[in-house]
Amino acid sequence: MLKIHTIMTTVMSLLLVGTVNANAIDDDISYLQKEWAIINYETVEDNREDKFYVLAKKAKEIVEKHPDRAEPLIWEGIILSTYAGAKGGLGALGLIKEARNRLLDAEKINPNALSGSIYTSLG
């Protein structure tokens, strides 16, 4: 009886950890989406570059937190691409290359993540 209880406790703990991890990735992706939308659509143009810079740093942290998932890489690519647009000029070229690389890295993990957003973003 004790063995069954131990097994059940272990299984329930693993399920809980999986749920927590699933919720963590969902929360992180939701955060990136919401912040991107606020910066892109509601922030005064003169402030966008700095805000996208900060969000790009946060996206990188989230990618490092979930290295086996494509979704954070896709959002990092989208954020870097939009940051490049806000930055403009020659300084944006490096950001564009970096964004493309993130999207290609995401494609290697899961080409269908976020309903194929990789291909929409790559053009």
Which residues fall in each region the model found?
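Bacterial N-terminal signal peptides that target proteins for export
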Residues: 1-8
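Bacterial N-terminal signal peptides
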Residues: 8-17
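Sec/Tat signal peptide C-region and signal peptidase I cleavage site
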Residues: 18-24
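Amphipathic alpha-helical repeat scaffolds of TPR domains
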Residues: 24-42, 67-87, 112-123
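Alpha-helical solenoid scaffolds that mediate protein-protein interactions
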Residues: 39, 55, 62, 84, ...
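Helix-turn-helix repeat elements of alpha-solenoid scaffolds
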Residues: 45-60, 92-100
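Hydrophobic alpha-helical segments of small multi-pass membrane proteins
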Residues: 98-103, 122
